[in-house]
Amino acid sequence: MLVCVSGRSGVTVGAEKAFQLARKNGKATMVFVSKCDLENANYFKILEDMKIKFGSTVCPCVVPAKLDDGTPVYINLFSQKAFKYEGGKQIQVELPDIGHRFQGLIEAMSEAIAETDDELMEKFFGGEPFTTEEIVEGMRKGVKDGLITPVFCGSAVNLQALDMLLYNMHKLLPSPAHDAFILAENANGEPVELHCTEEEPTAAYVFKTVADPFVGKLSYLRVISGKVTAGEPLTNARTGEVEKISKPLTVIGKKQVDADGIGAGDIGAVAKLVSAKTGDTLCDASRVVKMPAPVFPLPSLFMAVTVAKKGDEGKISSALARLMEEDPTLSYLNNAETHQQIIGGLGEQHLDVVKAKLKNKFGVEIGLRSEEHTSELQSPTNL
C-alpha cells in the first residue's frame, strides 16, 4: 500500500488512518512525500513527524536537496547518487552536500536492513558494507514483514523522482502471489482458502464501480484466483445471478485497453455488469464464495435539489441512480409531502462533489438548499 503525504501540510489524519489500516490488515506499506520541489516544503520535519505517528519502521530511501542555484534534486540513498529532472527526464548531477545528515541516513537505512537477517546484522556490526543484492533483498524482506516502511519523495505534478518510486514499488513491494491464501466463505458460512493461482476456479472481488456516460457501468475487479476472460459466466455470490463477462479491460489512467483476460493477482475492469455492486464477489459456479463486503457509513446530511434547467427533473433521477452505483454512501428520495427531490451524503463537500459530477458526467445542473419538514422525512431508500 502506498501512503501519500504532502511535503507542505505533512501527515494528515487521513494518511495516519490509512497507515494504521494497512498495518491492521498486514499490508506492506510504502510512503511517498510529494510537493518536495516547493519553496515551503519541509521534508525532514515531516520525516520526524512520520517517525512519531507511523513508528520506528520509517526508513527514508530518497531524500530531497537543492543545488546552489535552487534547483531541486533527489538523492537515492541506495545508489548514493543525485538526480534532477527536466520535463520528467532524469539527469544525474553531482551529489550535493547535506552535511552530517547524509551519513546518518545511510547508517539508519543500513541498520534497518541489518535487522531483517542475522547474517546481515553480523556484517553490519563488523563494519562491512552491504552489496546491492543484500540491500535489495533485506529491504524487500523488511517491507514484507512490516519491519521497514520505505519513504520516497518527489513531485507528482512535475514528474520528479517518480521513476525511482515506481522502480522500487516493483522491486520492494511483495507480489500477491507471495500471500499464502486469502480467506473467503461459502454459502454455509464456512471458511474457504483462495490461492493466487490461475489453476483454481475464478473468484474476483468488485472493489470499485464507476458510472461512465459512454460505456455505462464500469466494474473494477481484483482477481483473487483463476482468470476472468471474455464470455465467461460468473456467479454473483450475493445475488446468485449469473453475469456474462464482456471484454475484460486494462485501465491506464483514462485509457481503457482490451485485454485477453485478467489473471490471478491482477486488477482490471469489466463493463455493463447487471447485478454486480461494489463489495460483491464474482465466482465460477463450481466454487461460489464470498469475500467480506465493506460497511459503508450512512448519509448524515440531506438537501433538497433545485433544477437549474426546466425539464431536467427526469434526467436528475436517472443520473443520480447511476452515481449511486459508484457511491454507496449517497442516497436519493422523493419527499411525497413537499414534492422535493432529496439527496443525502456525508457532508457538504460530498454533496458538492456529487453536484459537480452530475454536471460534468451527465450535463445536468442542479442547486442544493435546505429541505423542508426535515422532522417528517423518512429514512432514505436507495434506488
Task: Give the label of every model feature segment.
Residues 1-375, 379:
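Structural and coupling elements of P-loop NTPases
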